């Protein structure tokens, strides 16, 4: 299982702070985020153990994923 934590607008949109899922890849995870459509999830920053990963990354049991809205400023 993969532990997923939500931050920022991602948390607000999904209505959850965290959840567990059985996705094997980031691409699969994008279809399992509660209360969010895939098109909304693909705009999020996806960090795996603190580092950005591709949609093809294969999870290992116990991985921790963070989903958060992009941060911008000026």
What spans do the regions from the language model cover?
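Ubiquitin-like/PB1-type beta-grasp interaction modules and other compact soluble beta-rich domains
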Residues: 1-73
